[in-house]
Amino acid sequence: RRASKIRTTLTAQDPKLVERVLHPHAIAAIDRIVQAGVRTVILDECHHLLDHWALVIGLLLARIRASGREPIVIGLTATLPSVDDGRAFDTYSGLFGDVDFEVPTPAVVREGNLAPYRDLVWFTEPADDEITFLTSHDRQLRRFLKAVFAGGEGLDFLLESIGFIGIDGEQPTGIDAQLEADYAFTESAAQILIHTHGDHPAALTLPRLIGNRRPSIDSAIRVCARFALEKILPDASRADEWHAMRRTLKDFGYYLTDRGIRAGRNPVNTVMAQSHAKNDAAVDIVHHELASADGQHVRAVIVCDFATEGNRRGRSTGPVASAVECFARVCADATTAGLHPILLTSQHLHVASADAQWIIPALEELSGLRLAVDSGDENEPEQADHLVTRVKVESSSPSAAVLVRAVSALMEQGTVRLLVGTRGLLGEGWDCPAVNTLIDLTAVATSAATQQLRGRTLRLDPQWPGKVAHNWGVICVMPPRISLDSDAEISRMNRRHEQLWGLDVTLPTGHAPQASDYLQVSDRPHPGNQPQPANTLLSGQFPQIVTGVDHSLTLTGQARLRALLEGDRRATINQLNEQTLQLIASRAATYEQWGIGQPYSGDTSHDTAVSAGKNPTFYSPPTLWTAVALLSGLCALLAGIIWPMLVMWGTHPVRILIALAFMVVLLGIAGAWRLPVEIWRMLRGRSHPARVYAGATVAVSRGLVASERGQRLVSLDEFQVRPYGAVTVGTQAMPAGYVVSLPDVPDASARTIIDAVSEVFAPIETPRFLLRVTFQGDSQRPSTLLLRMVSWIAQRISPSALYVQVPREVGRRKAGAKEFARAWAELIGPCQLVEVSGAEAMRPLAQARLASRNNQSHSRVRTVWA
């Protein structure tokens, strides 16, 4: 590893030094190629060109150029390296640049060259002993925070961190300046204050500003680190306290030095990623697969990260989570043991004891190797000898590749139907067409590793022409009863699915979007345009093919997962898994949904699925209903004035007309005509939310153009919004939201707009501008005296307001933010643009963030293949 780093550093400084670090044989090969006049270099599996061979190819290209010829380099790969590879990815990009042509996996499937598939997710909770460890970890963290901040010095530090001065009414004062200086740290310090000094006056008032959520582990640890750096480290007499703090933080996975703190290997995330419960989940998955309509076709492989090593936290006794331990669990179950499983790693070959007498001879015949029962290694985990038999190779030159081919042959024969192994051996390069079920227990999430693993099941199987692959990911989630936050597993799931295509499962079964499902809205008249489905896959014959979790989790499943992660004890993993099981009822149905051999356009586009959460972010319910009440009162008041006039003058038609004219003049002078207009616009937005999402899309596009980001955008004339419908979560009906797409806009421009639209409806972070959705905005629309008066009264009676964040690209220039607000007011309703600058803007930002979290709005960008 050090030699590789040195070579890379030297060659980055001077490419001519490459020849000095390469072997003479490599230099001789380059000389022969250049002398032969080669100009075109074709590199298959080019994703391997990350280190040594990248240097060789780089030198070859330089030598070809030096000979007077411009080289042509063609790289072929099915798995691009990940940007997470850092310098290696930079080396690769330096050779090939951006991708010039890509054939998405769905196209290869539709052409009939790969098997159709479905990506599935199975959820589990940590094992009992791991839950004991996690509960203890949670308790220790709380005790640690209390010990650090319970004393007078800790309390003073927290109050100093939030800038607390006193209480003004029901709000703490002094916090605004600290929020402006460092919002994230100040919010974390305030959260710790609330949960460690709940009876302090500041702690009693802060929840109204920032909420009552517990601080995350990361944020709490960083507050502790700053306390140690500022209060303990400078005092030489507190050296022992400093070292004790360092040791404690190390136990939580953080390394504290005099230069700051850095995150290490988080023990909570390690336990979740390598939980023993995943082995039980793998067995459960096999059970359900065998019980499905296509159970007789199942040939499964369980892939683990390590053969014998793994997480030991939370395991007082017994083996660690590994491939060996997983195989022992498989053999202990009667159903999975009946599939005649084999464990195969680079160093291990295990079989079920009940199968040893016939599997070992079969492997010897297929591999040509001499095999024998192994008595075991004292360094290996202990196993139940009556269930598992270790096999050793007695041949002088054993080859893992030979054994892999032999085991693959048994899988193809159907003699062996379950294989357990490691990613290192069964990842890239392993070819067994009979395998149709992958159970991924690994912790990898990079693009290359994820696609390589799932590619193992996509080979066409001559013995099953209707083959459909099931690729399972197993995700361990924290039980709601444990307050520790651990989103690493969910983040890993999301990163994996961002790289994978699959059949969209978020639409109701049998739903076929029609022309009436679309809205055509334009920021200027555009005659002659008729709304049409964006692509052939929206015709209702086949589901959409998308990236992201939408091809693995139904809308109900996604809502239940969010509830589970938010600590709702009514949500359970069984509810999540029940949703998944509905997707594996018939592989034949999945085969039909892929439309093998059917025509397709081959285009890709982007859309965003948005949900307004509990309260739509495009109107302010308390203020709206207060304004309605005031309008009703105003009408009653005018009626009370006019009625005595009619009684006094009589009911002659002329006198009635005079009274009505008098009322109209009064209302006109006051500008009351605008009041029902504004209320009507808000009510219409509530009744037809699709128009609001559409208006937001136009507002974003106009804001991008005004911010000069639009130089790379086309003129936006129209867009379409496809409704999702509604789902039920528990006993509460929640809107599933809408999918916003731009089918007639070039993909690059559409992606820019879609990303910005998604940001509008995402939880608020720290934007430069906010949009306050009010009953009456500022100068974005003309106002009247009565309208301003009613708005003022309504907001005093019911001051609640909702906020949306102005997208970063739109808010880069103030002109873009102003145009966004102007378009919002024109197309959706009144609003007020708030610049998040200065201490006075921090309180609205805190209120906006709190309302956004409570509202539970969310959005996600997807890529759609047509």
Question: What is the meaning of each model-derived region?
Answer:
Residues 47-51, 81-82, 309, 425-428, ...:
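Residues immediately C-terminal
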Residues 1-3, 8-12, 32, 37, ...:
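Conserved C-terminal RecA-like helicase domain
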Residues 66-67, 446, 456-468, 501-506:
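Arginine/glycine-rich "motif VI" loop of SF2 helicases in the C-terminal RecA-like domain
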